[in-house]
């Protein structure tokens, strides 16, 4: 499977630790106005809950984020569970 994003695989992204630890799936994605990607679960987060990882690492954890690779700057996508389609 090839890397689907137009950004470099080593692009820094924000990932919540719940996802990194395998406790929760990615349910919310934000492609911020500044180009930063955020991959979060459905919980409230403090700054301590977040970490920087590469875009490739986030993609390796959940390849379904490739379905929203063209999400415009300033837009969000979400889903109720990993079996549901992404909504914007």
Segment roles from a protein language model:
Residues 1-16:
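Negatively charged, low-complexity tracts enriched in Asp/Glu with abundant Ser/Thr
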